From Swiss-Prot:
Alphabetized SUPFAM superfamilies for the sequence: Ribosomal protein L20
Organism annotation: Francisella tularensis subsp. tularensis (strain SCHU S4 / Schu 4)
Name of the molecule in the record: Large ribosomal subunit protein bL20
InterPro entries: Ribosomal_bL20 (IPR005813), RIBOSOMAL_L20_CS (IPR049946), Ribosomal_protein_bL20_C (IPR035566)
Organism phylogeny: Bacteria, Pseudomonadati, Pseudomonadota, Gammaproteobacteria, Thiotrichales
Classification via CDD domains: Ribosomal_L20
GO molecular function terms noted in the UniProt entry: rRNA binding; structural constituent of ribosome
Assigned protein family: Belongs to the bacterial ribosomal protein bL20 family.
UniProt keyword annotation of RNA-binding present: yes
Amino acid sequence: MSRVKRGVTARARHKKVLNQAKGYYGARSRVYRVAKQAVIKAGQYAYRDRKVKKRTFRSLWIVRINAAARQHDISYSQLINGLNKVGVELDRKALAELAVYNKDAFAAVVEKAKAALA
């Protein structure tokens, strides 16, 4: 068997990690050992935050719906309860879009919910 020198593969691996660490501060973008740790941690944060992003957006939509609903003298929970009773199946993302960009349509939805609660 012939001898395998690993300089080429090591250089390629180091280059790959250092390219992934571009833009990092100080040694994190220059020193392989530090950069490798930084890249691994960045990947962990990215994985975690892809999951958290869904929760964050849902809470943002709820805040927006609640703020718009209270302008029509109804709380968020009452609005959702009323919509469920009527059978309106608008998700929170769609309701938030209506609340921000189409106030007339949102007002109509609120009136339906109020009618169901009365």
